Amino acid sequence: MSTSSETRETRETPGTSSGTAVGPTTSRATDQPTNQATGHAGHAGHAGHAGHAKGRDAGAPVRGTRLTLRAATLGRPDAAALADVDLDVPPGEILTVVGPSGCGKSTLLRTLAGLLPALTGAVEQDGRPIVGPAADRALVFQEDALLPWRTLLANVELPLAIQGTPRADRRKLAADWLERVGLADRARQLPHRVSGGQRQRAQLARALAAGPRAVLMDEPFGALDAQTRAGMQDLLVEVLRGTGATVVFVTHDVDEALFLGDRVALLGAGRLVAVRDVPRPRERAAHDDPARVALRHAVLTSLNT
């Protein structure tokens, strides 16, 4: 990392990959958010959403949001990925989305995020059209999106600073969230000084600190080893418990989809194949439960047809 004092600007929306120009611009020299990006997350999207929210305490409940697609065709004009999608995600649900590579999982997520407009049909949040990114829909991708020159604490503070949360308040909120994800002792570390799993924990804390009503996650644990991945799954369930946030979680791993989801959406052959309820309880020991085994078999069969 260069130590030059020249101003460098990186477009960064909390929880998005660093190459997505949908959020406010931050200056490495001043470390302050500016208003230069046309897609400022605090003002994008439809009216009535929490563009000026001031964050929330770790674990404090928020009101979830309803995400809806009706007769929606998704993708690029020259290459539609999904056709005639009807899907309703009620407030507070964890919907996992599973399917083979190239089936449109990420396209669906980016459409719900407001990064990619639908080609036809309706895409709505609480009955209003999604027309762009919004501060109350947080994004977490597999790629490391932490700003490398900011400590973990400062990274978690970033969306709160963008929202205008006073410095002392956002410092406390960020510290509380890092403690919640088990990183209190790493708060002053730079991202390159911690492991991949710890960076993903910090990204999760950053996504949730600002109190989003929806969290959209695109294979966030895909690059982690099996043991770290299982730990992150357990942590996600624990952190989300009682928050009220609506979650759409994309994965290619059927077992991950069944462990995390209240329902699982199956994509394949350019369409939404099915949406199935996942039996509970959500426990590792339930992996061999007959109902879970039957659902796993049905999901794999659907994906292979």
Predicted regions and their residues:
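ABC-family P-loop ATPase nucleotide-binding domain
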Residues: 1-73, 305
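ABC family nucleotide-binding domain
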Residues: 59-244, 248-255, 260, 266
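Conserved beta-strand-loop-alpha-helix hinge in the C-terminal portion
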Residues: 270-297
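Histidine (H) residue identity feature
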Residues: 40-52, 171, 192, 252, ...
